[in-house]
Amino acid sequence: MSLQELSEQELFRRESLNKLRKLGIEPFPAQLYPVDALSKEIKDHYDEGKEVCLAGRIMGKRIMGKASFAEMQDSSGRIQLYFNRDEICPGEDKALYNEVFKKLLDLGDFIGINGTVFKTQVGEISVNVKTLRVLSKAIKPLPLPKTDAEGVIHDAFTDPESRYRQRYVDLVVNPNVKETFIKRSKIISSMRSFLNSKEYLEVETPILQSIPGGAAARPFVTHHNALDIPLYLRIANELYLKRLIVGGFDGVYEFAKDFRNEGMDRTHNPEFTQMEIYVAYKDYIWMMEFVEEMLETICMDVLGTTDVQIGENTVSFKRPFKRISMIDSIKEHTGIDIAPMNEIELRATCEKLGVETDESMGKGKLIDEIFGEKCEGNYIQPTFITDYPVEMSPLCKKHRDNPELTERFELMVNGKELANAYSELNDPIDQKERFEEQARLSEKGDDEAMFIDMDFVRSLEYGMPPTSGMGIGIDRLCMFLTNNSSIQEVLFFPQMRPEVKTIKLELTENEKAIHEELKKVNKCELQELRSSLEMSNKAWDKG
């Protein structure tokens, strides 16, 4: 970037940088700084006269002659600093105060201070600074909001695209964003502690795979130069974890980064985090109770309550959760019994219900589309949707009482899928036949049909005990427990379009209408707008 492209503020800060060096002060020192306290700790445990060593960013300055105040922000919060010229410059040379602090330090710069804790006349806990050291110079100004005399906030850093692209700035100037990610860390920590308390083993499985199995999704493709073969970023870790059950482990789990080369919207990112667990000698009924206990425990650990505010809804994660079969759910919300229908009849039913289809969709996909459009969004309180048709679940065991169904559930919360679980298919002959059916769907053009993994079939031929498996979306769980409506709010660095390119999106007329309406409304009105437009989950998310 040339000097001509710099703003007035950036030019001023670079000039200050050079002046610091001329004074013999290194703006980016290498040696450690011996921090021994945090602002929150000082405020929570006030100890007058205690000597402390702090470091952080300058977020505010009030210059008043020989004495001044500054606000410093560290990793735990903010605290007021008091600077007296003669205390930080006890000798004849007053340049550290008169030149460095007053003129050359800007908002956003990092400093280190030693001082003593005290309270001002108005009772604000502060630190009386004795020594000052420059730790890092910021040559771009932070977008700090300002509040005018009427209480109106100006220059707030609120544009979502800017916030997601420059999360490092977002975290500095918007404390609530930092709290969201601290809570995310606590959610994952609580889940891991719960799983470890059950003595299940945390494992790692390959991210680069020769066959991307375990889910119905489009993979990312890459190439291994040394082996001269195509490889795929995993879409799920299911098949590798089940191989470990074959190998003799009774319970394994993994927090996995998975990748799906599909659409992006408020609840989907191409790179996402899942936790998958497989436990031998269990079934999907046991797994429902396990999931209930786990989610209730996490809510109590992180929030101190099982009642969670998600948008306009108060959702209770108190056990037990409601249960309903998929066929009964479709019948409840459409009045149609799909149980006896073949593919032709299902296609006609989709047309009657206004559900979009294409020729590549088989029976299972058609049922999935009906449920997604007409039922899914109605389940606000945690609800297990159980007993899926066999065509929808190629890795799942057939139902013990009805071979047309499978022992599968999905947990719906706030109108979205949160978890998916099976009584796992461990019959290698049946598994091979299911894979072959997926191959036929792929030939019809279904790019979400599962890949055939014959090595996995071979592993089953050595024998896998009865097993229940479950996958839960960590990003979506974090959305729910932090009351965020967008997945981008719970990912530090969500996938974004390149800044240098302008890409025109092709939208339907309905989606264009949503886009135009969204320009006119505030975030708090989104749910009301969605209700008034009567759009399905899929059309709303894309729009």
Label for each model-derived stretch:
Residues 1-504, 526:
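Class II aminoacyl-tRNA synthetase catalytic cores and aaRS-like
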Residues 503-517:
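Short alpha-helical segments that sit at the start of domains
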Residues 519-525:
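Short capping segments at the starts of secondary-structure elements
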Residues 528-531:
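A short acidic, leucine-rich amphipathic alpha-helix
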Residues 535-543:
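Short amphipathic alpha-helical interaction segments
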